[in-house]
C-alpha cells in the first residue's frame, strides 16, 4: 500500500516536472525568468562561466591557460 502510494506520487511529480520544463515552441524564451532569459541571449553573462577563472595579474602557469578569465596566460593572466 505504501509502495503504491509512493509510486503514484513519483509518477505525478515526474509528469509535472516534464510539463514545467518542456519547450514551448510558440513562445520560445519568453516564459523563462528574467535572469535566465538574459543569460540565454548572452551566454558570457552567466556567472557559471566565470567560476574558477583567474583575474588579470594572477599566476596561471602556461600559455592559453583556460583558468584565466581572458583566456590568455604568460605565467600571469593577461
From Swiss-Prot:
Residues 23-51 form a propeptide. It is found in: Secreted. InterPro entries: Conotoxin (IPR004214). The keyword Membrane does not apply. GO terms for cellular component: extracellular region. Disulfide bonds join 53-69, 60-73, 68-77. The presence of a 'disulfide through disulfide knot' structurally defines this protein as a knottin. The cysteine framework is VI/VII (C-C-CC-C-C). Belongs to the conotoxin O1 superfamily. This is Conotoxin 6. It comes from Conus imperialis (Imperial cone).
Amino acid at each position: 500500500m505504501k509502495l503504491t502510494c509512493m509510486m503514484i506520487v513519483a509518477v505525478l511529480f515526474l509528469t509535472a516536472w516534464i510539463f514545467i520544463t518542456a519547450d514551448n515552441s510558440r513562445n520560445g524564451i519568453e516564459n523563462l525568468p528574467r535572469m535566465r532569459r538574459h543569460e540565454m541571449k548572452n551566454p558570457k553573462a552567466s556567472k557559471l562561466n566565470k567560476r574558477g577563472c583567474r583575474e588579470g595579474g594572477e599566476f596561471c602557469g602556461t600559455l592559453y591557460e583556460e583558468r584565466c578569465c581572458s583566456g590568455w596566460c604568460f605565467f600571469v593572466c593577461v
